[in-house]
Amino acid sequence: MEEIQRYLQLERSQQHDFLYPLIFQEYIYAFAHDRDFGRSILSENLGYDSKSSLLVVKRLISRMYQQNRFILSLDDSNQNPFWTCNNNFYSQTVSEGFAFIVEIPFSLRFKSCLEEKKIVNSQNLRSIHSIFPFLEDNFAHLNYILDILIPHPVHVEILVQNLRHWLKDASSLHLLRFLLNEYWNWNSLITPKKASSSFSKKNQRLFLLLYNSHVCEYEYFFVFIRNQSSHLRSTSSGVFLERIYFYEKIERLVNIFIKVKDLQANLWLVKEPCMHYVRYQRKSILASKGTSVLMNKWKCYLVTFWQWHFSLWFHPRRIYINQLSNHSLEFLGYLSSVRMNPSVVRSQILENSFLINNAIKKLETLVPIFLLIASLAKAKFCNVLGHPISKPVWADLSDSNIIDRFGRISKNLSHYYSGSSKKKSLYRVKYILRLSCARTLARKHKSTVRAFLKRLGSELLEEFLMTEEDILSLTFPKPSSALRGVYRSRIWYLDIIWINDLANYK
């Protein structure tokens, strides 16, 4: 317990009080609608709604609190569309400014953390592709992974409590609680109903803030427990823990696991020095060099942790234990797996010669062709079998605009999947887009694809057909023999900060 107390003292976050008055400042809504903070608010037109003034916001909050939400439930609001429209307008207007205000403590804390650790705030640190070189270096030596789907739904009060550990402004928390309960009943959970779906779409900024704070709360506890269970302490993550009832919850968690109060004795059961954790969106991966028995212990530990700390039912089937050698992991739009790469070396000593068989583990990243074709079919570029079709919606555009749109999609996919181990599937996707482009142009000119290409020539598709290898050849006009191998190898870029829409399978 003394070590935990010292840990809390080192990681004590700053208290940020008096955020609630910022809701009534007009420039907050200007920033909420225009994220270019480098421009002067006095000399530039920020393009926000001029109705978001001090007086208007005060009236909106007053009207929101005057509504009797216990009488007008969600079912009653369906019978009164006028009340629903006005109430949604009040909540959405205030929530936009509120989400921006609550982000202030998080951004300040992140900035101070970078300054303390002397880390340069570079865009390259945010690149999605930067995680794959890490997987190449570490996952090839591991045996098992826990494929975890972060559980939800979460009760709205738990979301408010998570923010309470970061914010000390009670008025702001009361307003957040009121906004959330405008869409969900107090005794219900956040479920994918029409109300919650409407809330998440209209208030994406606030919804993402709440979800990220919920995931951060889980990860802060998890990293702390992970550090306690290993001799190799993690130094790359800044960890903040809940201050309220921390010792009591840790004691309950430990008692459930083995019925004793010694934290180290319990964590000894899951001690594993070689373990890696990766998360993106609602999916996380816990990879280890241990055995399946050890991974089952971690699975039980995580299920117990979620149920007791978040008062949330975490079904064990949301965690899958897979062996890396015979399982493909779907992550960030790629299918990743560890395969044995055999190599034969012929050695000769004097008159004797013999062959040496070596098998090296290698991480392969493949294009999930079937999932990608399903995304293309959903976007009306091909049918479900992968046969290209025309895009009639774009047939009214100019030829150059049509080619530019198809070419941009092809380049973006080629750019995102440049790290694929095998390019054959990527070439098939580019073929579908190329033929779909040709059929769209032929449909516009009321001609066949063959006649259209013969009449206008294939030079119209030169930009569309440019590959990553062509871009490299333009960068290095006369490549050496060593660079020729680079063209055929995997290329990871540090400028990709979000997943491609077609690769984001849902």
UniProtKB/Swiss-Prot annotation:
Its main location: plastid. The keyword Chloroplast applies. GO terms for biological process: mRNA processing; RNA splicing; tRNA processing. GO terms for cellular component: chloroplast. One of its GO terms (molecular function) is RNA binding. Pfam families: Intron_maturas2 (PF01348), MatK_N (PF01824). The keyword Cell membrane does not apply. It is found in: Plastid, Chloroplast. Keywords: Chloroplast, mRNA processing, Plastid, RNA-binding, tRNA processing. Usually encoded in the trnK tRNA gene intron. Probably assists in splicing its own and other chloroplast group II introns. Belongs to the intron maturase 2 family. MatK subfamily. This is Maturase K. The gene is matK.
